[in-house]
Amino acid sequence: PKNDVLKVKRLHVEFQTSHGMVHAVKDVSLEVKRGRIHALVGESGSGKSVTSLTIMNLLAGNGKVISGDVTLNEKSILKLSGKEKRQLYGDRIGMIFQDPTAALDPLFTVEQLLLEGLRKHHRMSKKQAREVALESLRMMNLRDPEELMKKKPYELSGGMCQRVMIAIAMSMKPDYLIADEPTTALDVTVQKQILEEIYQLSRKENL
């Protein structure tokens, strides 16, 4: 829906460590409407990534939401059942992770990585999913997507891995896309290209 609103309400997250409890996020609130671009700014270690991972329900096992909530259209997404979470994160909210080499399974080909989510969440035939996957790779200005689909992440450069990860996220047609420092490990020229590609895709898809 056009009037979707994703809210983080007074979020407080802590991690249990060998040195005791560490306050990772304290009293963070924000509101994101669909079709708008927002930047979360802060020093290294200030909780930007933890806030993103909390929205995605991907906190590490030693992390805990002490108080606050994350809601989509006023419905808490931190208290959903396993099935509801899979539907939400497959269809509504996607994420581009900071380190593509860690986020992409090295045992899978690019084709397998792209098709897995499309077939699982959108119930497409293999042929339909493959067409969407190829189009997503073309949108990221990746050369020879047919050949690229046969490769595994370790055979690709950092910039190509990052583009593949964005293509995977975009192929799912999410309403919201969270990008956690998506260009950190890349050179300045590639950084600019990828940020521009994300921006153009967000305008085209009303993310």
Task: Walk through the language-model features, giving the residues of each.
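The feature captures the beta-strand-to-loop junction immediately N-terminal to the Walker
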Residues: 41-42
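Conserved ABC transporter NBD signature motif
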Residues: 65-76
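ABC ATPase NBD coupling module
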Residues: 77-94, 120
